[in-house]
Curated annotation (Swiss-Prot):
GO terms for biological process: tRNA modification. [4Fe-4S] cluster 2 binds at residues 196, 200, 203. The gene is rimO. This is Ribosomal protein uS12 methylthiotransferase RimO. Residues 8-124 form the MTTase N-terminal domain. Belongs to the methylthiotransferase family. RimO subfamily. Residues 182-413 form the Radical SAM core domain. It comes from Cutibacterium acnes (strain DSM 16379 / KPA171202) (Propionibacterium acnes).
Amino acid sequence: MSAADHLMTVHLVSMGCARNDVDSEELAARMEAGGFRLVDDPAEAETVVVNTCGFIEQAKKDSVDTLLAAADLKGNGITTSVVAVGCMAERYGRELAESLPEADAVLGFDDYGDIAGRLRTILDGGSLETHVPRDRRTLLPISPVDRPTARAEVSVPGHGTAPDLSASVTPDSGPRATRRRLGTGPSAPLKMASGCDRRCAFCAIPRFRGSYLSRPIAEIVEEARWLVDHGVKEVFLVSENSSSYGKDLGDLRLLEKLLVNLDQVDGLEWIRVSYLQPAELRPGLIDTILATDKVVPYFDLSFQHASGPLLRRMRRFGDAESFLNIIDSIRSRCPEAGLRSNFITGFPGETDADVAVLADFLQRARLDVAGVFAYSDEEGTEAAGLDGHVDEDVVTARREDLADLTDELVSQRAEDRIGTRGRVMVEEIDEAVIGRAEHQGPEVDGCVTLVDAAAVSVGDIVDVEFVGSDGVDLVARPANA
């Protein structure tokens, strides 16, 4: 049976972070350009493609469960194949294929450019060579400034160009991008860079995502225009480390210039920057974020802990006082700015005193959102081989205590906003009008319920007064109501 005899339907499941969502939209564009039709119901798809997450243990378990659930559809008379792509597939490759025979193929990032061809081979009954993992840091030059010229030889998801795509996916004229929107909301992630040059002891991401590689400003701006043409009002700039943007393009302050260029995109209302490294958060970048009209005052800061000695053990920089100085610097200029971060507890060598330092920092920092994660060993990381591993039950107890503390603190921070004014982007109108304020990132930072807001549409930005809170979520009414 040839591919011409097939339905050529595919269902794509995107797991994990916003960076993976961008990769999924690239895959969707390439599959559609290759003759496949995307369907919302997996039971109607001949092929189910799962864009997996390989970051932490729970994410890997969720990815495996999703692949197994997709494989269960094979008896429905329509679904014939299940394909694993994404970070878990890239990271484990053959090992994943051997442990999960229910998947018909495990493909790596190098397969993305011809993903449609790979799927046609599977439909025709052919077999594909299972991806063999390699350290992707070795694919680009060690020197960052030498990487742009080598970029064309390496497959980097989210860095694709569009000349090979049909007009049904991206137009012959106007802004072009190698992506097909899978959502309809007014906000969309926009990848500004990939990979990471840091060597955090707990993190395996650089091994399978590779060395840091920035996208040129013109390419990002073009994609932003394309997103606006497809209904987007807010772009959420994503990468593994946004504050390093431009290091490989010869300009360590290129992020400031990118924000100014994006500010000129007609129809774009909000620009949001994610995942900033505190050690690289320079005063000029803070100034640009706070002074550029469309850039929302939002700081996603990767603290990870607050104990200086433990951060050194993590191969990171900073301590509670230096982090508080950053926060004070931001809030002295913009008291309403949103600040969020994530923290790891239970890292090898963490003591009760370290936990006390972190708890004290959280109380003094008054973050809008704080996530607390229990440390777990990741294969191939320095931390997995360290001494001083903390007993699992102790790690669990520490995480629960810190999570309870952060829940209380972020609720208090939300209460502090009652009586103040802000702006809210409307995202959903159903039984209630739901949106997000400038200090709230997509999906993870809570929402705002708008009351007395009858004449609004999705994508509208409304001046509001905050009148109530429920945990991290807020209630607001139009300021002129």
